[in-house]
Amino acid sequence: MSKIEKMSIQGVRSFGIEDKNKQVIQFFTPLTVLVGPNGAGKTTIIECLKYITTGDFPPGSKGKTFVHDPKVAHETDVRAQIRLQLKDVNGELVAVQRSMICTQKGKSTEFKTLEGVITRIKHGEKVSLSTKCAEMDKEMISALGVSAAVLNNVIFCHQEDSNWPLSEGRQLKVKFDEIFSATRYIKALETLKKVRTQQAHNVREYQVEIKYLKQNKEKAREIQDNLQSKEKQLAVSKENVKSIESQLEPLKDRLADIQRNLSKVMRLDNEIKALESRKRTMEQDNQDLEEKMEKVFQGTDEELNGMYQNHQRSVREKERKLNDQQREMDRACKESQRLNREKGELLVQQGRLQLEADHHQQYIKTRDSLIKSLAAQLELDGFERTPFNQRQTSNFQMLVKERQEKDEAHANQILREFSEREAMKQRQLDEMRDKKTGLERTIELKSSTQSKKHTDLKNVKYELQQLEGSSDRLQELDEELQKTERELENVEKSCNLEALRGEVLQLQNQKSELDRNVRKLDQEMEQMNTHTMTRTQMDMLKKDKADKDEQIRKIKSRHNDELSLLLGYFPNKKQLEDWLYSKRKDINQTRDKLARLTKELVAAEQNKNHLSNELRRKEEQSASFEEKVFDVCGSQDFDSDLSRLQDDIEKTSKQRAMLAGATAVYTQFITTLTEENQPCCPVCQRIFPSEAELQDVINDMQSKLRLVPDKLKSAEGELKRKEKRKDDMMELKPMRQMLADLKEKEIPEIRNKLVTINREIQRLKNDVDEQETLIATFASEEESAKACLQDISLMERYQMELRDVERKIAQYATKLQGVDLNRTVQQVSQEKQEKQHNLDNVSGKIELLRKRIQDQQEQVQQLKSAVNELTAEKLHISSNLQRRQQLEDQNVELTTELQCLAREIKEAREQLFPLESTLQKLQQEKQELLQRKESSYREAQEKVNDIKEKVKKINLLTKDIEKYSQDGKEEFKEQKESELQELIGRLNECEKLKEKVNREMVTIRQDIDTQKIQERCLQDNLTLRKRIEELKRVEEERHQLLKEMGQMKVVQMKNEYQELENKSESLKTNHSLALGRQKGFEDEILRFKKELRESQYKEAEEKYREKMIVMRTTELAIKDLDIYYKTLDQAIMKYHSIKMEEINKIVRDLWRSTYRSQDIEYIEIQSDADESVTAADKRRTYNYRVVMIKGDTALDMRGRCSAGQKVLASLIIRLALAETFCLNCGILALDEPTTNLDRENIESLAHALVEIIKSRSRQRNFQLIVITHDEDFVELLGRSEYVEHFYRIKKNIDQCSEIIRCSVNSLASYVH
């Protein structure tokens, strides 16, 4: 058995929060007695035991009021801790600790539980485990060996709940159910019942599902059989198709061979025609070339090639020289470019150097100006005139440096003087602050002590004030107590509880009648649910019928227009399949015709491509000839241009001859006029009248003579150019003839042929398009019909299923014949709701009356509690009057100490005031000193910084001036100017070289142009000989192709092709028929497979078997649940009967041995069957009540017994329950058991408790804990041999509870 050994309490209710206030109590065996006045903290010990074992707070407390109040403790956080040491049911030592914290936040407090700790001794070592509250509660229940309900309601029952056995019926039932642990089993029974109901509902659903699954299984089997039949037919059809294909394959191969040979014949014919056309073209081209050539070379090919190669070598040599001159020109150009770049770079450098020279002069002027200004500022002599030389500049820098050092020394001296004065002033300030701080600290400490003493004095005065009126208060309490007792007596007389109970009984009868009506309606609902299932199945079938009708309508609506347009009517499946077969035959015939037209179109397009290529070649040749003629002539009027050119050549030749003779004529005329004494005009023989006129004529002739060479040269150049152009035009004359033939004859002929063949191709294309359109139309119609075929098949299946559904609907309609369908489920449900509403109203009225009864009972109880509270306050005031003298002495002592502290604080404050004024004065003096120091130092420093800044600028300018001279920038500038002049001279020489090379290149180009004219003539001779050779090869190739074509037996091949094609067409027709049948079988197989893949047929047999297994196993499970439900219910009832008999026996014995009056023989607990339980619950539940037996009559004790009888009955019932249910835990705590008992019953209770202890003392772990304020009751218990010590609970001077261990022998002296 489990046993508690000791417990420590800290920070709970009135128990202090300091470690010194921790209270420890050790529990004795078999009896522990706790004595103390009201409010001392006795009940707190029971509350701590209950909390440490169950985790439940006292009634009306959520934890905040359970912990010591932070406002009373003058703390923000208050921690509470309870520790319990016990032995569990196995005798092992266990230590348990629970902690709490309460935090003051503004006006509200916040409560929180901390992690608990359980410590066990294992193998001689302590093992601690931190757990959460819920886990610790389970551990404690396991360790003590009793349930939480027994701990709360029996072992550690709170004083406020101690009378629960006589509480209201519903609350009493909950308590007893928890103690009996019946709640869990009742819940288990309810769960079993719900599971059984749900499973029964599932079985009904399974039956409906199985019915449909069976239909689906049979339908799936039928579809599977049809599928196998179609697959066999498909295999036979595939064999037939393969046989036809094996016959077609060699025919196709032979037809392909013949087709290739015929294509080859067509290709050979086209090639022969192309070669003949090419031969004619080549012959004409050769003839045109011979006519164009001025001279046809008569030598051998080797001689012609030798001359051509020699001529090419001469041209290449001249071109090489031209390239050399070009390279020389390129080198000269590159050199000129390089020199120009260097010239540009030198010009840029010259500009940059000139800019630096200008800056240098500006720096010198700026520096001298700054030196002159600063020298005047510093009053330095010798620096009035600029410019300054190097010596003057150095002398100036030295003088300025000395002046700077002098000014800086003066500024530092000022800074040091002020710093010394500042340090002295700071020391005075520190001394004053130390004195002031010491006095303030003294005042603060004494003020704090004064505040504490004031608080203590206030508390003492408050207690004295409370005690002032204690005597008067005792008299008032006596009067209030008498008044309250009279009021209690009047209330008990005025209560009309019996009338209210009678009204409740009448309403309960009405409730029972309504309950029977509701059960009757439930039975009617259950009966209607059976027919509802049949109705539901019939509704489902009707819905299925409507769905199938809608599907058939949709299919017809979707395809009616299309099929009517194709066939002229809406067909069935067989009619549609026949139409598809005929349509496939039309498509095959059209495709064969299309193939023939395509072959003819390909041949025509090949011929067109050949003619197009030939036309393109001729047009390109014509364009090339026109371009060459235009390049030479400048227009397309070749003959007119040639005639004009010949006239121009004759005119230019005459002009050249005239100019060539003019030189000799003018020379002779000038010689004659110069040498003769009397010259005359050489033309008219006129003598010149004067020398001046003669000289004018001579000058005019000399002037013309000087112009003759240039004009002669120009005329010769013009003549050569025109002759060259004439040669070029003569070379183009054969080309001109060829161009005319191309434009007038060959190109028009080819274009006419192209027009003819284009018309033929267009005709063939139209035919092909027509056949393709026809095929597309046939194919579209076929696809449309095929798309409809699946829906037509589906529609036929829907029609079959529709007939099956209509048959089932007729069967269900037969089943429902004779059933009254006027009263619907909704009507019955509505009537049930009305009855249920009335039932709820009656139940509400009953609860309202019970509440009134309870209110009256509570009013009586409140008055009784008021009587108890007044009695307790009276006892408390009596005990407090004994502390009055001690509080008066403490008042005098605190008053004296406070007067002394006030005097000392006043003296310290008087010393503090002059110190504060002196401290402020010193701080002001220090601040003024700092301001003067900062001002003086700033003025001196600004003067020094100004000089430094100006010297810095002068030094920077001097540095730049010196750097310019040191870098030699002036000499470098002169050097670059010299280099620029030299570069300009080299650039002029390079330009002269370029002019020379250019003249030589012009001469070489003229020679090359002359050589190329001769080269063209040789090239034409070579071209002519190559064309003749090519013409021979073309003729040989044409004869070869004619020979090859004659060996191919074209007529025999065409006859064989026609015969094989007819045979192939026959086989193809049979093949198409076989394929059509095969396609029909495949469509059927696909449709059957698709149906089998549908959700209702997929694995239909497996689903049926599985659902059947589930239903059978569920039915077996329902039977097992019924058996288990009945067995568990019977076991609960039997256990309940045994325990109630055992409890009532103990209650009777304890009552007879304890109660001293003769009005009640004994009491017992009666458990009556609950009349409100409906038949649908199928089990009994109990309502509990405590009755008292008077003679042969059993009366409810609740409302009929006195307060003392109520307390005694509740105590005895708790003792009986502890005896019955605490087999593993011998602990029982009684809080104020003598409340409301008279002296005789107190004595008998003490005797009964001693007897119980005596009977249980043989159990080592039996522990009875008694808490009381009645010391006479303790003395009665102490007369037994089981009590040697007891605990006295009281409050110390800090109003914190203390637990003091006392001997029983000291009790008598304390009482008396």
Curated annotation (Swiss-Prot):
It catalyses: ATP + H2O = ADP + phosphate + H(+). It is found in: Nucleus; Chromosome, Telomere; Chromosome. GO terms for molecular function: ATP binding; ATP hydrolysis activity; double-stranded telomeric DNA binding; G-quadruplex DNA binding; metal ion binding; protein serine/threonine kinase activator activity; single-stranded telomeric DNA binding. Keywords: ATP-binding, Chromosome, Coiled coil, DNA damage, DNA repair, Hydrolase, Magnesium, Meiosis, Metal-binding, Nucleotide-binding, Nucleus, Telomere, Zinc. Binds 1 zinc ion per homodimer. Gene3D superfamilies: 1.10.287.1490, P-loop containing nucleotide triphosphate hydrolases. Residues 203-342, 415-558, 587-628, 712-1070 form a coiled coil. NCBIfam families: rad50. This is DNA repair protein RAD50.L. It comes from Xenopus laevis.
